[in-house]
Amino acid sequence: MSLMLEPNPTQIKEERIYAEMGLTDEEFAMVEKILGRLPNYTETGLFSVMWSEHCSYKNSKPVLRKFPTTGERVLQGPGEGAGIVDIGDNQAVVFKMESHNHPSAIEPYQGAATGVGGIIRDVFSMGARPVALLNSLRFGELQSPRVKYLFEEVVAGIAGYGNCIGIPTVGGEVQFDPCYEGNPLVNAMCVGLINHEDIKKGQAHGAGNTVMYVGASTGRDGIHGATFASEELSESSEAKRPAVQVGDPFMEKLLIEACLELIQLDALVGIQDMGAAGLTSSSAEMASKAGMGIEMYLDDVPQRETGMTPYEMMLSESQERMLIVVKKGREQEIVDLFEKYGLAAVTMGKVTEDKMLRLFHKGEMVAEVPADALAEEAPIYHKPSKEAAYFAEFQQMKMETPKVENYKETLFALLQQPTIASKEWVYDQYDYQVRTSTVVTPGSDAAVVRVRGTEKGLAMTTDCNSRYIYLDPEVGGKIAVAEAARNIVCSGGEPLAITDCLNFGNPEKPEIFWQIEKSVDGMSEACRMLQTPVIGGNVSMYNERSGEAVYPTPTVGMVGLVHDLKHVTTQEFKQAGDLVYVIGETKAEFGGSELQKMLHGKIFGQSPSIDLDVELKRQKQVLAAIQAGLVQSAHDVAEGGLAVAISESAIGANGLGATVKLDGEATAALFAESQSRFVITVKRENKEAFEKAVEAIQVGEVTNTNEVTIHNEKNEVLLTANVDEMRKAWKGAIPCLLK
């Protein structure tokens, strides 16, 4: 029972209780000035959570403004629950990615599960039906028992929620590096489909209209979750387990169906998910976006615990709840609709004209705050930025090609590195076929989901090589966007737009803020060049444990349009006799590479370089060749270089191999991680047409020998590897480490 007496306004100021809630002295003075008086305990809570980095982006807004956010297909950019992009035929794709890093570090199963639940709500709150889930995960090295536990529980949490709710988890990525040991990253992405006329906004228009609460009841879980996400993890974080919410996927499944039915009613004015900061953010944001106010009667909030205070109800982050505004007089229709699904829908307030958020409890007004002050007027900080000390040192290093004695052994060792190895152990736990629209299942460059009732598909991927970004944030930022687009193109899709999840350390450290600025500069430049605007996303700061930050990890979630499903292309070889081509030049670039990490146990030097003009030209050529029906298989060359890419294309096929000849110094030819490269196979009869359309070098052919043989330019064999043995090593690596 929380019947402890709340501190009064004078105590809050004199004892600096606001500081424990996350407000600085200057911020508290601003609140005092806005209100013209000292705030009470509930009001202090409202400001502390709405002005947290997690809700207000107060440290990152100046940087986020650099992103291009408009384009001819963009129907909704950043600022709503999720972004929306037109895909023709009166249809649109809705998508967004968010982090649930801090909760997952402490309570990995529920942290990951509720991350999935929250991102699904962001998508269906726009009026869209969720059709696919993806995720991007980062962990420490699997040798550590703690990391094994986090990895197994996070994957189980994602699977548990996604499988129950009946939305396929179709793709994602998992990378392992020591810097994530104490602070894993769990980024979840949801993609939905909508007809243009069904698009809804989270806005509270129309004075006198009714504010209703729908979905699950409110408990004490997740109070101050947004504030918890805006500080560094420490040993005492374990004590904050109550801040991790518990998800109920069956409740959410009912909520989706009820909300999608609700959206068809003209009674609905606005709808928003109660996510971070729960009732506070949904009410303040909906009022502020509409230029209105809201009055709420907290006695009417469905509560699953006794004696909850206004402070607790407003800050709870209990899951599976939405706030809606409906036309006055239509409330009973809404109640009946939700009752049909066994869900609560209660009237708890109304829209007002005076732009104030007013809260009443037990007949008394317990808070009166301008909605704009909470939602829009958080202070914005231009943090000091300073080039990281390591950067100049890395830039000046003379890069030497790593010494490799045995190419075959090295290839096998690379295939067994957890970052490269098969993620089948992960995605086998996910139901990626539910709804039966999945055209390309996990394991290829991008997943493809059918757009029902059409011949179109949506290609989708998450990408980010954090090592490159650590070595050179600006170049690494460009590479993250370019690689995502390359994966979409290899699957037969035209890249449309991105959502981003910016995972960084403590922005109050100038070297971290420099990483944020530079990587956003690089991403923005690539988004402009590749014409993939940023339509929404999420910032996750303070990803540190004991003062050590994670690698800068601005994850890119990209969606592309496959204009005709017959263009869908996958990475595995298709038939013996096809010609193997490599597009793009290989340089001796090993900085941040899988080979460098494997041989030295650390990364250093310069990241691979990228020329965005060249990248765009190659992507356009490859996509045109795929659409012309000239391409059998396509695979982006990424971690592990050409040897790994060719091996993966053979591993995915049945009984096929390849014989190829690679020019240049052998270690670089096999394992360097130069950008803007593709491995493509083409039917022999399409050789001339393909070579006319694409600048590519034929390096060999697909065989039915079940072996990959790679020669150097003198025709000497560098390595011969049996595909079954490679597959066994590649598939067995992660299960073996988990034993």
Curated annotation (Swiss-Prot):
GO BP: 'de novo' IMP biosynthetic process
Residues given in the record as ATP binding sites: 57, 96, 500, 537
One Pfam assignment: AIRS_C
EC number: 6.3.5.3
Compartment(s): Cytoplasm
Keyword Hydrolase: no
Coiled coil ranges: none
UniProt keyword terms in alphabetical order: ATP-binding, Cytoplasm, Ligase, Magnesium, Metal-binding, Nucleotide-binding, Purine biosynthesis
Active site per UniProt: 54, 100
Residues annotated as binding Mg(2+) 1: 98, 538
Broad class of where this protein is predominantly found: cytoplasm
The reaction(s) this protein catalyses: N(2)-formyl-N(1)-(5-phospho-beta-D-ribosyl)glycinamide + L-glutamine + ATP + H2O = 2-formamido-N(1)-(5-O-phospho-beta-D-ribosyl)acetamidine + L-glutamate + ADP + phosphate + H(+)
Entry GO terms, CC: cytoplasm
Top-level EC class: ligase
Keyword flag Metal-binding: yes
Binding positions for Mg(2+) 2 per the UniProt entry: 122, 273
Protein's pathway: Purine metabolism; IMP biosynthesis via de novo pathway; 5-amino-1-(5-phospho-D-ribosyl)imidazole from N(2)-formyl-N(1)-(5-phospho-D-ribosyl)glycinamide: step 1/2
Residues annotated to bind substrate: 99-102, 121, 245, 317-319, 540
Protein purpose: Part of the phosphoribosylformylglycinamidine synthase complex involved in the purines biosynthetic pathway. Catalyzes the ATP-dependent conversion of formylglycinamide ribonucleotide (FGAR) and glutamine to yield formylglycinamidine ribonucleotide (FGAM) and glutamate. The FGAM synthase complex is composed of three subunits. PurQ produces an ammonia molecule by converting glutamine to glutamate. PurL transfers the ammonia molecule to FGAR to form FGAM in an ATP-dependent manner.
Family membership: Belongs to the FGAMS family.
Quaternary structure, from the entry: Monomer. Part of the FGAM synthase complex composed of 1 PurL, 1 PurQ and 2 PurS subunits.
PANTHER family, sorted: PHOSPHORIBOSYLFORMYLGLYCINAMIDINE SYNTHASE SUBUNIT PURL (PTHR43555:SF1)
Protein name: Phosphoribosylformylglycinamidine synthase subunit PurL
Annotated source species: Bacillus thuringiensis subsp. konkukian (strain 97-27)
Organism placement in taxonomy: Bacteria, Bacillati, Bacillota, Bacilli, Bacillales
Gene name linked to the record: purL
